[in-house]
Regions:
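Short, surface-exposed beta-strand-loop junctions and turns on beta-sheet-rich folds
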Residues: 42-43, 90, 119-122
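Charged phosphate-binding loop/patch that engages nucleotide di/tri-phosphates or the phosphate backbone
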Residues: 107-135
Length: 135
């Protein structure tokens, strides 16, 4: 099945300043620990109790670091963590970047990440990682 969750953007004036809504969170899918954040580093709009993203990469707390903020799609491995920015889907704020989204195929032993650029049926970027290779 599919799993959908979200974290608010830093300029989401309703949800980001609301302590009842997680600005950053950890989830687990098929044994992969995933950290979700809008920004890849701390932001001046953060709440006092927000997790600092800088402390997550390479700490062993997450296998996947999923972030946005820059609107630039990318997939890279950093200090044993797969870092993914799906890009953006907001046509009214292109910031010079094409419309993109990420598809994560997660199995207990393997992760395949595809970045699709719209319009288009094929991935622009596709990378596969074995969980055992991240350690």
């Amino acid at each position: 099945g599919c799993f959908l969750t979200r974290v608010p953007g830093t300029w989401d004036t309703v949800y980001y300043p609301d302590p009842g809504v997680s600005n950053r969170k950890f989830i687990e899918i098929a044994g992969w620990r995933i950290f979700l954040t809008h920004t890849p580093e701390s932001h001046y709009n953060d709440l006092a109790d927000d997790i600092r993203p800088e402390t997550v990469i390479g700490s062993g707390r997450a296998d996947i670091f999923l972030f946005g903020h820059t609107h630039i799609a990318e997939i890279r491995r950093r200090n044993g963590t797969v870092c993914i920015n799906p890009g953006h889907m907001s046509s009214d704020e292109s910031r010079g970047c094409p419309l993109t989204f990420a598809l994560l195929e997660i199995d207990p032993d393997e992760l395949t990440v595809s970045i699709f650029q719209l319009p288009g049926p094929h991935p622009r970027i596709r990378k596969t990682y074995r969980k055992s290779d991240l350690r």
